[in-house]
């Protein structure tokens, strides 16, 4: 199927995707697991994405509005926490991720970090900083559903240049993130296999040309997969 979910038992109330008063119907964990139970536009509209330049592509290709994408090029799960870079309106003050999430109270947070952090942190630091970020976000928006996105692959030639960022290494960190998600009852959203070639590297048709970033084909497919699986 190309998708791997890891989640643990949370009650339907805790993973409520939509307010019945807003949509005219209740959405439980069971129905949310079915494809397209929630209207695609509504599903995307109630989701906020937090990440680095790979997440920023959602803005570059105008697939989502700025108030739903909180991302800084080159950032990690640590550096993203302190920078007031988000404007939720033309005249609004610049907010940190924590302040913006507190203000917006999104139904769902999709968090995607990794490629910038792997070379800078030990495994322990990597997981600790991820945990600190999520603690900060759930502290101000306790009803947000947490979706941890698997780190997506890089091209084969890229990691020959950057030996610390092999897809084997990325897979290892994804196993750590999956374990962490299971332990904390978060959703682990792994669509890596959808974007890999036969050798397990980023497939050429999704490569923006630098082996690390993604092209428009990728983001269109990514949105399709989100709508299909609705994590």
Predicted regions and their residues:
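Catalytic His-Asp segment of secreted/periplasmic serine-dependent ester chemistry enzymes
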Residues: 154-231
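A mature extracytoplasmic/lumenal domain signature
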Residues: 51-54, 62-63, 115, 150-153, ...
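Conserved SGNH/GDSL esterase-like catalytic core that processes O-acyl groups on lipids
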Residues: 37-129
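Loop/turn elements at helix/coil->beta-strand transitions in domains of secreted/extracellular proteins
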Residues: 44-46, 105-109, 141-146, 184-187
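Active-site segments of SGNH/GDSL-like serine hydrolases
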Residues: 112, 116, 138-171
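N-terminal cationic-hydrophobic initiation segments that often serve targeting/anchoring roles
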Residues: 101, 137-139, 178-181
């Amino acid at each position: 199927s190309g998708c791997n979910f890891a989640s643990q038992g949370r009650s339907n109330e805790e993973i409520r995707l939509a307010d019945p008063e807003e949509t005219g119907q209740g959405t439980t964990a069971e129905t949310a697991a079915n494809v397209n139970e929630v209207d695609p536009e509504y599903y995307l509209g109630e989701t906020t994405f937090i990440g680095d330049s790979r997440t920023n592509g959602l803005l570059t290709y105008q697939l989502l509005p700025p108030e739903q994408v909180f991302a800084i090029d080159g950032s990690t799960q640590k550096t993203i926490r302190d920078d007031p870079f988000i404007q939720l309106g033309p005249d609004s003050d610049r907010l940190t991720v924590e302040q913006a999430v507190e203000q917006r109270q999104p139904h769902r947070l999709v968090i995607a970090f990794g490629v910038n952090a792997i070379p800078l942190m030990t495994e322990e630091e990597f997981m600790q900083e991820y945990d600190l970020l999520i603690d900060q976000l759930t502290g101000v928006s306790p009803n947000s559903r947490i979706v941890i996105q698997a780190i997506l692959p890089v091209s084969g030639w890229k990691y020959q240049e950057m030996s610390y960022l092999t897809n084997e290494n990325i897979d290892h960190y994804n196993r750590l993130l999956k374990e962490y998600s299971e332990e904390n009852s978060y959703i682990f959203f792994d669509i890596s296999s959808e974007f890999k070639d036969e050798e397990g590297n980023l497939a050429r048709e999704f490569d923006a040309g630098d082996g690390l970033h993604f092209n428009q084909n990728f983001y269109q497919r990514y949105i399709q997969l989100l709508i299909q699986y609705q994590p």
